[in-house]
Amino acid sequence: MSKVIKFVKKEAVLFISLAAALISMIFTPPNPEYLGYVDWSTLGLLFCLMAAVQGFGSIGAFSRLAGTLTRRFHSTRSLGAALVLMCFFLAMLVTNDVSLLTLVPLTIALFRSLPEICIRTVVLETAAANLGSMATPMGNPQNLYIYSHFSMPVADFFRVTLPPTALSLALLLLSVLLIPRSKLSAPESPENAADVPAGASGKRMKLRAALFSAAAAVSLCTVLRLLDWRVCLVVVLVCVLTADWRVLKRVDYALLLTFICFFVFVGNLSAVPAVRELISGVVSGREMLVGVLLSQVISNVPCAVMLSGFTGNAEQLLLGVDIGGLGTLIASLASLISFKLYGASAGAKKARYFAEFSAYNFAMLIVLFAAQTGFNALSA
């Protein structure tokens, strides 16, 4: 029973989305149209990207890159700034979740004896991962979903995301100046360093790296709409199964199931004319504001899926759920990853972490939302 309770707590968003889907079935009983609710191309592409990224993680690629870069810095501020910026840019390519899973354990190990610096750096890394991930379609699940669901042209996507991303980078560059400066002591090994199989031959590792690179390249081509997602799925499965089938166990299937539950929930609500008109009336013309506010309560990935069924304004919805990833601890599930990693470390000061997290996140949220609101007004 304790294992079940632990699993439910760990996957709370999945079970909330499942409950929402089941309740919505009261209004629209199960029928064959349910299959049409699900955006299979988005789910397939998301699976492919996660499998490719987890493949690189399984051979220690990200940990080695992070370790190589961090050895070049000798003060807490310069190292902290480097880690924050690494999170920002890495998230654009491998998602906000993966950048945090790679760099937060390293940060905790490096700053274990400096609790104030550790907290501030992890808080800023979390903000950096969420903000950097907004720049690209594959940076986070909500971006990939909106980009795919609304068939956004690549140029339009970057036109929307690059200005707030640039402002976010400026905010982060100012924020890292608040990391105290002191001399670094010798770092300890990260607790959660990636597993590289003992005794793995150089030739075998190179083959695995090549196969995971091929999977990533095919996934990127699919993001750019150069390949059909079904072709991508087959190629990625062949590459991963050939390289290391255990990588498939690392894929976040709970996230995929969460998407399916919300697809059913939104589809069922949309099938009821009165409900569809009511929600559409609230969302229409306020996509960014509603996206920001709703993300604070249910997190930005479910928010993107839910609101997409009631608006055609992909650009403002995209801005709302990306900027809305700042704020509360649950606004972005990636933020919970950092909190769990830090909270599990020796001597963790969770109350201090929560206070700093809230202060930095809400400050950045207010600045970005105000700036984007002003930009929208000028562009109208």
What are these model-derived regions, one by one?
Residues 1-16, 75-76, 201-211:
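N-terminal membrane topogenic signal
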Residues 2-33, 44-60, 178-181, 218-246, ...:
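Structural signal for alpha-helical transmembrane segments and their membrane-water exit/capping regions
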Residues 37, 59, 63-66, 213-312:
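Transmembrane helical segments that form the transport core of multi-pass membrane transport proteins
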Residues 40-42, 71-84, 112-121, 206-210, ...:
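Membrane-interfacial loop-to-helix junctions in multi-pass transporters
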Residues 83-85, 89-134, 145, 305-319, ...:
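Hydrophobic transmembrane alpha-helices that form the pore/transport pathway of multi-pass ion
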Residues 4-10, 32-42, 152-164, 201-204, ...:
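Interfacial loop-to-helix junctions that mark the boundaries of transmembrane helices
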Residues 13-14, 40-41, 67-81, 119-127, ...:
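Cytoplasmic-side transmembrane-helix entry/capping segments in multi-pass membrane proteins
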Residues 2, 116, 155-203, 336-380:
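Juxtamembrane and boundary regions of transmembrane helices in multi-pass small-molecule transporters
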